[in-house]
């Protein structure tokens, strides 16, 4: 069997037989090894393109490429905004761009397995989270199959008046994840992307002084009607009417 393919299998199965959070707690592998694993994941992504990929447009490809560079900032800012009425023409452009990226995702390979995300979360939200709660991300959610990549995104504390804490997510992807590694300008990130309003059920939480480790699994919105839900960005409880609007948009 090809050595590079074996490395990829090792990468994708990193936590198959390990304890929760083992992979993300391990010392980082060498830059050379991480780069090679990312390249292998990119190759796998390209090889996994199915019949839907034949319908992807040049505009959609360009949108995904731009998303990985800077487009994610505008798209996610718009999706997380509580009031978009003041966006004007920029709002219309953002909505069109978001639709284009979502359309592209539906034509890119699905990924099922484990991925990781490093970020900063409001301490007020972290303090009330329990296993079984569901986190709803109103924006696109970026993850990586490489824990080393995920950890890079939680190094620098954001400039925010809110009290934040570093969080490392271990994500069991059952649905909704699409690899953009074959198109992304940052293919070394081995990125798996979720469309807006992805739902993640908390399966395990481990709190330390420096980090909070959270294990989650992807779930359908329709499967968590009677579950405590929180907006991952704002930290606010997702009310039933708001939850319904997320499902129906």
Curated annotation (Swiss-Prot):
The keyword NADP is assigned to this record: yes
Domain TR mART core residues, every copy: 31-223
Active-site residues annotated for this sequence: 117, 142, 191
EC number: 2.4.2.31
Keyword match Nucleotidyltransferase: yes
UniProt similarity note: Belongs to the Arg-specific ADP-ribosyltransferase family.
Protein name according to UniProt: Putative NAD(+)--arginine ADP-ribosyltransferase Vis
């Amino acid at each position: 069997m090809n050595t590079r393919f074996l490395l990829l299998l090792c990468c994708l199965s990193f936590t198959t037989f390990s304890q929760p959070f083992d992979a993300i707690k391990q010392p980082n592998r060498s830059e050379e090894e991480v780069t090679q694993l990312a390249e292998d994941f990119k190759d796998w992504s390209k090889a996994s393109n199915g019949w839907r990929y034949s319908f992807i447009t040049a505009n959609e490809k360009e949108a995904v490429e731009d998303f990985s560079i800077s487009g994610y900032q505008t798209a996610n800012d718009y999706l997380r905004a509580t009031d978009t009425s003041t966006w004007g023409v920029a709002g219309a452009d953002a909505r069109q761009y978001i639709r284009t990226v979502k359309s592209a995702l539906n034509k890119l390979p699905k990924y099922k397995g484990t991925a990781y995300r490093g970020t900063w979360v409001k301490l007020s939200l972290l303090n009330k989270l329990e296993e079984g709660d569901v986190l709803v991300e109103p924006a696109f959610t970026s993850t990586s199959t490489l824990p080393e990549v995920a950890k890079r995104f939680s190094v620098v504390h954001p400039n925010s008046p809110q009290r934040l804490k570093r969080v490392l997510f271990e994500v069991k992807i059952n649905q909704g994840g699409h690899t953009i590694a074959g198109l992304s300008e940052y293919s070394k990130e081995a990125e798996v992307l979720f469309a807006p309003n992805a739902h993640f059920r908390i399966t395990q939480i481990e709190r330390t002084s420096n980090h909070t480790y959270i294990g989650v699994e992807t779930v359908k919105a329709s499967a968590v009607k009677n579950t405590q839900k929180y907006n991952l960005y704002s930290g606010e409880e997702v009310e039933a009417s708001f939850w319904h609007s997320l499902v129906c948009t």
